[in-house]
Every structure is written in C-alpha cells, then in structure tokens.
Amino acid sequence: MENKNKIKVIIPFYNPGDFLDMCISSVLTQDYENYEVLFIDDCSTDNSYSKIPGCVYKHDENGQPIKDENGELIIIEKHPLLDRTKCLNVMAWKASSRATALPNIHNGIMNFATNPDDIVVILDGDDWLSGKGALSYINDFYNQNPECWMMYGSSKWTDGRRCCSSPYPEYEFKNLRAAPFRISHIRTFRAGLYHKIGEQDNMFSCMKDKEGNWYTMTYDVAMFLPMLEMAGFEHIKHNSKPLYIYNRDNPISDDKVNQQKQWDIHEEINNKSPFKKIESYK
C-alpha cells in the first residue's frame, strides 16, 4: 500500500498583495489529500490575511499559539472555506508585531509540524506551486527515496524560465560553509531533522545575530545549513522537476531591498560553528 505522508505546508508572508491569491489557489487545488496548511501573516498592512480561507488563531508576541483553559486554540477570525478545499485543514496565525520570516517559520515548525516524520514544505506567500500535482510528487519522491531527509529544487520564474538549481557534490560536505549554497525552491524536509537542531543548539543561536536577534533575511541559509550538516550527503536529494513558481515581481523582495545585507548575514552564518552529523532524524 502506498504511504501517504503527512505534508505540512508553511506559508509566511508580509504584504504579498494579489500574489497571495495565486499562492492560495495553488495550495488549495492540490490533488493530494493528506496535507495541512499554515499561513503566517507577519503583521501585513495590506489586509491580505483576510483572503485566507479557514481560521485565524491568536498567538503571543513570540509566535506561540495561545490556548484557552480547555487546551483549545483560540480563534480570532473565521473566513469561509472554498468548496474545493474539501476536508483540508487550513490554519492561519496573525502576528501582533513584525517578526520577519525566520522566527515565524521556526514557530510554525515547532508547533505545527510536531511529528518527526511530517514532511515540511516552505512556500513564500508571494510564490506558488507549479501545478495541482506538486504535493503528490513530493510524497512519491520521499517514498521512492526512503533514505531522503531533505529534498530541494526545482522552480521556474513567472515567465517560464527555469531557475538555477543543482545537486551538491559529495566532496562539498567536507566543509559546507565554504561551499556554494545550493538549496533552492522548492524546499522540503522531515520535521524531525529541524527539531534535531535544538539538541545541538537549544537556543537556535545558529539563526540569530550576535545580539541574540533572529536574522531578518537570508532565512534559507540560516535554517538549512545546520540541517545539511546533520543529515550528510546520503540523506540530501535534489529534484530536477520544477514544482515551484518563484516570483521576483514583488518590489519588497529581500534581494531588491537590501542585497548587501543579505551577503553580510550569509557570511556571518558561514563563520558559525558547524553541526555534527546525526544517525537519525527521529
């Protein structure tokens, strides 16, 4: 019998405008059934969270969901579910203050993807999946590659051109922090692999600056370098089929706003201590 992995799609966004419509539509029309979606609104000012079908849940200033005296999540708003979502579980968090993507994604994984076998898919709110079979393909990929703990790639620009994406050669795992960073959209991994970061760095300082603040951009490098190092070459797989549409038309994209800061943060991350390889993500 085919294994239907639980897939957790985490979608952080800030002022995505009408691009969020494409994102929502691409996620809610998937032909895969065993998946859940968490939208995280980083205090948008364009009222984009009102487009999200489902429930908006209350959480504190650290991004932790707040429960009532019965242990139930507190719903602050309800938006109508589209018929096409069927029994899909859609959740949303609305931040009370700007936090940026990295702490929002971190809190999403730690609170939403608690089973180590969950497959986490990161989808930015101004991007979208390339077709209705994207999640089915991801499920099949992990089933066909049981040794895989992380699968990444590939994507296209909105004009149809393929984005640059390449597999890691094995020799680069001798010093990943000196190698080119190759983790491109679509970014997926077993939740347990991310949880293991906390066993070697319980404060997740690998994702924070010298003052202890979460990095405000370059979240992909901060998140994925530790996971790459812990997993090792044999547990990382590159996918060549485009499953993701990467949208650079949003004028507030990080690489358009402050590219130099991105490079500076990347260099700071590379200078941190590497993580030790692990035997299992569970």
Annotated model-derived regions:
Residues E2-Y281:
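Nucleotide-sugar donor-binding/catalytic module of glycosyltransferases
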